[in-house]
């Protein structure tokens, strides 16, 4: 039996631009948090990771919706807002790191 493969429509240019706008900040903040996660309480890390999962799910849903309806500006705004929430959460998590 051949496994089913989901076909995902390509993202419209506006959505790719939103992805690109936040990619660098998210990557840098994720790297800093990953390098220093042992300096935070495990319960804090668990809460941050749970919140990131919720945000990532919202980002995935918005991207799927934009692939299906590329001209929907409301969904594009939701995508950007989700990325903003992710960046803010990562900034706050990094701000919790003890200063050395």
Question: What are these regions, as identified by a protein language model?
Answer:
Residues 1-100:
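Polar, acidic low-complexity tracts enriched in Ser/Thr/Gln/Glu with frequent Gly/Pro and Thr-Pro motifs
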């Amino acid at each position: 039996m051949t496994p089913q493969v989901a076909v995902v429509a390509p993202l419209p240019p506006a959505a790719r631009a939103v992805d690109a706008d936040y990619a660098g900040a998210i990557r840098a903040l994720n790297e800093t948090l990953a390098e220093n996660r042992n300096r935070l309480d495990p319960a804090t890390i668990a809460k941050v990771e749970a919140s990131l999962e919720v945000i990532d799910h919202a980002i995935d849903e918005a991207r799927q919706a934009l692939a299906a309806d590329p001209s929907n500006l409301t969904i594009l705004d939701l995508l950007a807002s989700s990325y903003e929430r992710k960046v803010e959460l990562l900034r706050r998590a990094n701000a919790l790191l003890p200063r050395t």
